[in-house]
Amino acid sequence: TSSGTGLMEGAVRSCTAKRAAIFSVGAFGDKWYKIATGNGVPSDIFKSELGQPTTPEMVDAALSTGKYDTICITHNETSTGVQNPVEEIAEVLKKYPDVVWCMDAVSSAAGSRIETDRLGVDVLVTSTQKALALPPGMAVCTLSQKAYERTASVPNRGCYFDLRSIYDTIQKKDYQYTNTPCVSIMYAMDLQLQRIMQEG
């Protein structure tokens, strides 16, 4: 129960054991950096020129230093309309199998094709109020096995957005969560996903 920003915080805080490389093409990329630094997560920001995407070369140059174990990228930057070339970035990330990839897809998930598993995205964050066409108030994310395993090496994951704690609770107890869920939006999303599947 939060906006997408909450799970962005959960992603970078739960998955960064060493240092995060944050790639910004606008306001929401800058938000990744603000979240990381506000939570004491060591991080560096790599900005593109206004209206330009994060390039695979930028990602490769940063990761080749060996300083980073997490990268944060905005898929579709609402403030500029730039959509990052995630297919090409995914190819670069194959060279760095230990790096956890966190993606803000708040304004694109359910509106753009994002093959999370094929691309190798470890944590994809979205929320209900954009392409899912639901009221705001609930964020959802994917969590890869690699990202889950990484969380074990991060000592200060926080409480409310501790992805490991949330995942473990859901796996152990049906219909139980670490915090009070937004049940009304969960029902609405269930219906909306059924409608999407029927339409194809």
Model-derived regions: residue spans:
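General beta-strand structural signal in soluble alpha/beta enzymes
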Residues: T1, I45-F46, C72-I73, W101-A105, ...
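Conserved beta-loop-alpha segment that forms the PLP phosphate-binding cup at the N-terminus of a helix
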Residues: T1-A21, V25, G29-Y33
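Short, well-ordered, mixed-charge alpha-helical segments that flank or form enzyme active sites
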Residues: D30-K31, Q52-P56, D60, T78-Q83, ...
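Active-site-proximal loop->helix
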Residues: K31-P42
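Active-site phosphate-binding strand-loop segment of PLP-dependent enzymes
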Residues: P53-S108, V123
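Conserved active-site segment immediately N-terminal to the catalytic lysine
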Residues: D117-Q129
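Active-site C-terminal subdomain of aminotransferase-like
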Residues: Q129-G200
